[in-house]
Amino acid sequence: MASKKIDRLSFDATLEELETIVHQLEQGSLPLEEALKQFEQGVHLVRAGQQKLEQAEQKIQILLTQADGTEQAVPFQPEQGEE
């Protein structure tokens, strides 16, 4: 998958693709060249995923900034089923 295509993936699709690659690498049945290619692809996916998370964090900060410019600290409270 080309780097530009990775950038277009949603975060969930990026994570799913990364999980597939990790599973393939953990099996240990890929030839060395293919394993290296998959590893490189995984690195690109990790970087893209991190970037998407950083962008989401920035959007949240913008949304939590009050009209007077001060930031409102809102603690994260997971829903009961997510702990």
Curated annotation (Swiss-Prot):
Principal location: cytoplasm
Top enzyme category: hydrolase
Catalytic activity, EC: 3.1.11.6
UniProt xrefs under InterPro entries: Exonuc_VII_S, Exonuc_VII_ssu_sf
Domain of life of the organism encoding this protein: Bacteria
Chemical reaction(s) catalysed: Exonucleolytic cleavage in either 5'- to 3'- or 3'- to 5'-direction to yield nucleoside 5'-phosphates
Molecular function terms from GO: exodeoxyribonuclease VII activity
SUPFAM superfamilies: XseB-like
Function, in words: Bidirectionally degrades single-stranded DNA into large acid-insoluble oligonucleotides, which are then degraded further into small acid-soluble oligonucleotides.
NCBIfam families in the cross-refs: PRK00977.1-1, PRK00977.1-4, xseB
Protein family per UniProt: Belongs to the XseB family.
Protein name: Exodeoxyribonuclease 7 small subunit
